Amino acid sequence: MKKFVVYSLFACAAVLPLVAQSAADQGGLTRQQGDQILQELRQIRQLMERQGKPAQPQEEAPTKAKISDLTGVNMLGSKNAPLTIVEYTDYQCPFCQRFHITAFNEIKKAYIDTGKVRFFSKDMPLDFHPNAMRAAMAARCAGEQNKFWELRDVMGANPNSLDMEHIIGFAGDLKMNTQTLRACIDSNKYKDMVQTDVLEAMKIGANGTPTFIVGKSVGNGVDGDLVVGAMPFQMFDAKLKEYSK
């Protein structure tokens, strides 16, 4: 796990500026988003300095990924949709936030709501985001009250407000039983499941957040391309059209 964290730090340090430039090219970053990106880079640099900067990975990054069984994973859309997107997310990641307030809404309208794509949510909380694990467990706990996607959306839009009190406040606004939610989060009952997602992300070659598998539905699984970063809708649209042929 430590090796994964160190490698992820290096990969994120390389990927963040590229995604930031892509975001700027799409219409510019807000001042707040720019500040979040700078803060992310500073945190990564500080952790790399403490752990010792790793050598740049020499192996070529994987471009394909396959998961055979997504049974039990939180899903939006029709289970019979011909195409699948799996996201590995970190609720404290500013680029995950950017994806969900931009490209995701377009994907949902064009593909998920029309029955063409089923969208699965998995977790990849990074160690240098202290509130990310709590948020991942909170979303799963919200699922017990049939509010997984609602709480996920609110937390994803507020990556800097993921301490326990803010999460409970979000839950209250969503008319959830906040005592039940707090008890569930405190129990750590979903921690092992979140960590299983992280190990799976390592196995397929994910090296930053958000990471996606975009491809054909194969039974209860997916076989497709590995995509890293908050890419624009146009990129997802092109890949989905390619897999629709």
Task: Give the predicted meaning of each segment.
Residues 76, 162, 227:
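Short clusters of hydrophobic/aromatic residues that line enzyme substrate/ligand-binding pockets
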